[in-house]
């Protein structure tokens, strides 16, 4: 299976071309075709010789993804189900915001983190996506904009789809360099957010990268007992280890950390738990932010339900009274398969039923 050329950073593409007897400017031309003109085949690169186009075709594909399902919400949110070359399925979501167009990308096929409320982990991790497969998600959403011819562009990226980004660290970092490159898509680092469930050692590595990309941490509980019961990752990286790494990140980068907190009715949404959360973040209050997230119910996790609005607001009020920077997140795509991993899970179930029916 040929890798996608999207897997290469600009420097790597230059090195690859020079090794094959080409001048550096040839790689720059190819890069422009990929990320500025956004062609979908090497044959469209009209200033590249046929011989070198043949070498490109022998070495790479362009976009490795095939579109399987598209769901569009009344609010303009678009959810894509893409098929990988090996037949595996992944999800990507386009969210229209007042500040621009944000795309949520997937980094793994399945997830091993094992959060008990999440649809992503219904199917265990089967493999990591390579950086080209992650970048290809952005390119196909941008193609959707290009085809509309309204001058729209992907302006923001959130690495919050299926999988744990820091469990696929090398490929995610390569992806970030590709989409942030000023000579390509030029998506600003401060418009990119990477979310982790709390791999403390990788948070430290990320701090040392020196990038301006935003960090979000999926917290979802204010104490170890509850967090370990709903997020298995907490057994390896309890809150003490996690917050030590977060404090290191803040000290090293002087950048704010966002905490994501899904509101689960009568599980993590009490007044007492709001106070615990306020106390937990007290020492980093100036450089932290809490995002309260309405829960999208998942049929396979019917032990959980969405917190009523009055409980969310009461929780929010406690945080605000304690000086915590916080917001209740705006919902997107509530009339489609909104929960992360939900569309993929449903489609795989339908595919299995079709196979069974033909036997």
Curated annotation (Swiss-Prot):
EC numbers for this chain: 2.1.1.192
Domain Radical SAM core: 97-329
GO terms (BP aspect): rRNA base methylation; tRNA methylation
List of catalytic residues: 91, 340
Bound cofactor: record note: Binds 1 [4Fe-4S] cluster. The cluster is coordinated with 3 cysteines and an exchangeable S-adenosyl-L-methionine.
Key words, A-Z: 4Fe-4S, Cytoplasm, Disulfide bond, Iron, Iron-sulfur, Metal-binding, Methyltransferase, rRNA processing, S-adenosyl-L-methionine, Transferase, tRNA processing
Catalysed reaction equations from the record: adenosine(2503) in 23S rRNA + 2 reduced [2Fe-2S]-[ferredoxin] + 2 S-adenosyl-L-methionine = 2-methyladenosine(2503) in 23S rRNA + 5'-deoxyadenosine + L-methionine + 2 oxidized [2Fe-2S]-[ferredoxin] + S-adenosyl-L-homocysteine; adenosine(37) in tRNA + 2 reduced [2Fe-2S]-[ferredoxin] + 2 S-adenosyl-L-methionine = 2-methyladenosine(37) in tRNA + 5'-deoxyadenosine + L-methionine + 2 oxidized [2Fe-2S]-[ferredoxin] + S-adenosyl-L-homocysteine
Disulfide bonds: 104-340
Protein name as it appears in the record: Probable dual-specificity RNA methyltransferase RlmN
